[in-house]
Amino acid sequence: MSRAWYVVQTYSQYEKKIEQDIRLLINEGVFGGVVLDVKAPIEKVEEIRNGKKRIRERKIWPGYILIELDLPEVGWKDIIANIIKVQGVINFVGVSKGQRPIPINDEEVKSVFMLTGEIKANKSIFMLYDFEEGERVRIKGGPFDSFEGLISSIDYERKKLKVAVQIFGRSTPVEVDFQHIEKI
């Protein structure tokens, strides 16, 4: 027996439903203790739209789920066949029909669980912003509070914008954090 995580391809938009169906089959004992866990990995994303923050969930791998198996050396084909029979499951990733599935390595599993927040990471909430160059915005906070200008560049790594504001009748570039900007 070799306990490991595997990636299963599913119909897109059905990941949660398939996770629930497999979890139900686990609880009913259909897989005889071979299927240990199943996850449709999601991450929490902080999104700013129209100046309002909200946290939403986003699928890490749309169209895929993770399944933890303690796959025996003998009889594994029946287990795999039963998993593939679940409505919405397409196949295990990286294998042809009749082949033994290949598990993903521990580093990949760890990175997915860090994104989902199941393993502690520096920050498990990521920011999404919908700014565009040339867009008119208002600065809120800091020395340029309530100044309006046009976005001239966006630095997603540093989470900063360059905004061209009018100071003494001249266009002056000002660097501002994403959180200090609102759309007009």
Curated annotation (Swiss-Prot):
Record keywords: Transcription, Transcription antitermination, Transcription regulation, Transcription termination
InterPro entries tied to this protein: KOW (IPR005824), NGN (IPR047050), NGN-like_dom (IPR006645), NGN_dom_sf (IPR036735), NusG-like (IPR043425), Rib_uL2_dom2 (IPR014722), Transcrpt_antiterm_NusG (IPR001062), Transcrpt_antiterm_NusG_bac_CS (IPR015869)
Entry superkingdom: Bacteria
Family matches, as CDD domains: KOW_NusG (cd06091), NGN_Bact_1 (cd09891)
Similarity annotation: Belongs to the NusG family.
Role according to the record: Participates in transcription elongation, termination and antitermination.
Protein known as: Transcription termination/antitermination protein NusG
